């Protein structure tokens, strides 16, 4: 289990890192790992970033506020749109930046369409088996219906998962009008439709 302050052995502690810090990027890129190891470290950093963002909340209306709108714009959206996937994209984009690794994730803010793109472009990363750091996707009514997502932070047997999710409330709802934010959740395993773990891309023996 990675140390939450320093998930990559021998690297700079995450609380000292910033994506725009060139020195940090060079230090991380000096880590001599294989492609799948590098992507695994991106995933681990995404979990750290997600934990740091717990407590981020909407301000001034549903799906509004400086932090929320920044995530939406960075993910190609507009203020006022649902932002659970924008939160996941933010965590992973910071992970890619920290590891000086190009993003492999599809863009977009619609959960079902994102799942479709992952299944087409990243089939070896997609599974119905959860792993810590994986992107958890919920779209039980099909690819075109509204969905939800989060980042897996813990697995409790075959019963439930711990996640960190954006655009959720303390009752566990999604995209409500009651002041959503970034919160840790525990949900039944069956709630989730698909898991995407980029650490499995290019792993030995995986096409």
What are these regions, as identified by a protein language model?
Residues 65, 109-112, 188:
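Helix N-terminus capping/helix-initiation residues
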Residues 2-18, 25-35, 142, 146-207:
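Aromatic- and glycine-rich peptidoglycan recognition patches
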């Amino acid at each position: 289990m990675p140390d939450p302050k320093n998930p990559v052995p021998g690297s700079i502690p995450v609380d000292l890192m910033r994506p725009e810090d060139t020195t940090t990027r060079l230090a991380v890129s000096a880590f001599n790992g294989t492609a799948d190891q590098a992507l695994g470290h991106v995933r681990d950093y995404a979990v750290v970033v997600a934990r740091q963002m717990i407590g981020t909340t909407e301000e001034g209306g549903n799906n509004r506020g400086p932090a929320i709108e920044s995530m939406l714009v960075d993910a190609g959206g507009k203020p006022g749109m649902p932002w659970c996937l924008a939160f996941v994209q933010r965590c992973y984009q910071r992970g890619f930046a920290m590891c000086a690794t190009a993003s492999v994730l599809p863009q977009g803010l619609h959960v079902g369409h994102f799942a479709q793109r992952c299944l087409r472009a990243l089939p070896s990363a997609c599974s119905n088996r959860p792993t810590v750091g994986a992107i958890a996707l919920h779209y039980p009514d099909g690819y075109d219906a509204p969905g939800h997502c989060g980042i897996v932070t813990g697995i409790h047997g075959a019963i439930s998962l711990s996640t960190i999710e954006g655009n959720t409330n303390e009752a566990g709802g999604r995209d409500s009008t009651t002041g959503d934010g970034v919160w840790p959740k525990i949900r039944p395993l069956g709630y989730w439709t698909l898991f995407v773990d980029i650490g499995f891309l290019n792993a030995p023996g995986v096409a």
